[in-house]
Design a protein with these regions (language model features):
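Cysteine/selenocysteine-centered motifs that mediate thiol-based redox chemistry or coordinate metal-sulfur cofactors
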Residues: 14-18, 105-129
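Low-complexity, compositionally biased segments
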Residues: 9, 61, 102-106, 120
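CN hydrolase (nitrilase-like) catalytic-core segments centered on the catalytic cysteine
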Residues: 4-95
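A short, polar/charged loop-to-alpha-helix boundary motif
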Residues: 92-110
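Short amphipathic alpha-helical patches
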Residues: 39-40, 70-77, 104-108, 124, ...
């Protein structure tokens, strides 16, 4: 499980993949604004880069009395190729159900070889900053 704000960081998404994750869920409570366009950009990229499915869940409506803004919903499932294959609306509480072809995980991982072709010896600076 990746939680809300975590989705902005590819390092954690990679660790989940390297540890064998096949399906990653990211529950979120995000309002419209700066990060909305990233909602359908970052998580499909994580799924494709790591060869796993993602369930990307965002709430809908407004939270009173705080009135932080409108939660934009748009929950979806994305496959290991980075393709969104089921999506909910922006405005309604919905139950989104989808079938996952788990064979696709190995197919994508063996085709793209992103884990094999990593060069962790060049990443040391990431942990020093």
């Amino acid at each position: 499980v990746y939680i809300c704000y975590d989705r902005h960081f590819p390092d954690g998404a990679r660790i989940l993949g390297l540890n064998g994750a096949e399906i990653v869920y990211n529950p979120s409570a995000t309002v419209a604004g700066l990060s909305q366009y990233l909602w359908k950009l970052e998580q499909p990229a994580h799924a494709a880069a790591n060869g796993y499915f993602m369930g990307c869940i965002n709430r809908v409506g407004q939270e009173k009395p705080w009135n932080l803004g409108k939660f934009y919903g748009s929950s979806y499932f994305v496959d290991p190729r980075g393709q969104i294959f089921a999506q909910a609306s922006e405005d309604n509480d919905e139950l989104l159900i989808a079938d996952f072809d788990l064979d696709m995980i190995e197919e994508v991982r063996s085709t793209w070889q992103f884990f094999r072709d990593r060069r962790p010896e060049t990443y040391g600076r990431l942990t020093e900053l």
